[in-house]
A protein has these predicted regions:
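N-terminal nicking endonuclease/strand-transfer module with a His-rich metal-binding environment
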Residues: 1-168
Length: 168
């Protein structure tokens, strides 16, 4: 499993990227954690509004949006929606984002299974979650723990491959 963390200035851009993929039929939303309603009962506006409310708690933070992709080896195709959601939730908890509102999208637009997670780094009390060295200090141990628990191909054992987008 390979985890990629990108931070940004615009939750709208990250959110719209994923929702546009859903509209194109190459992704689906499989989870909305720490939201007041179940995923299927959330409108587009409701999904984005909770993220925006968090950001309003601390307007001094410029890099406040977090876009994470969890990428699995092609041989791990066929993971069920519930398993993928469980993996995303464990990963977020282990990197210190378990209490944050986050959206989980399953994408089908490449030659390997992968998830996208949309969240922010502003806590309910307005303090920010430090993103400095998040990859090394939190993401790497979380990734390795999940690889071991689910018996996934270790990122270190995978050869770098070019993934070719599949026609839809």
């Amino acid at each position: 499993m390979v985890a990629v963390i990108k931070t940004g200035h615009s939750i709208h851009r990250i959110f719209n990227y994923n929702e546009n993929k859903v509209a194109e039929g190459v992704a689906s939303i499989i989870g909305a954690e720490n939201y007041p309603l179940d995923t299927e009962n959330l409108s587009l506006k409701m999904k984005l509004c909770l993220q925006e409310r968090h950001l309003a708690l601390n307007t001094n933070v410029s890099r406040n949006s977090v876009h994470i992709s969890l990428n699995f080896a092609p041989s791990e195709e066929g993971l069920g929606k519930d398993t993928l959601k469980e993996i995303a939730t464990k990963y977020m908890r282990e990197i210190g984002f378990g209490e944050q509102p986050f959206l989980v999208y399953q994408h089908f637009d490449s030659g390997h299974p992968h998830l996208h997670i949309v969240t922010n780094n502003i806590r309910n009390d307005g303090s920010r979650i430090d993103l400095h060295h998040l990859g090394i200090r939190k993401s790497e141990p979380a990734r390795k723990s999940i690889e071991k628990e689910y018996n996934f191909v270790r990122a270190e054992d995978q050869k770098r491959q070019r993934y070719i987008a599949l026609p839809v």
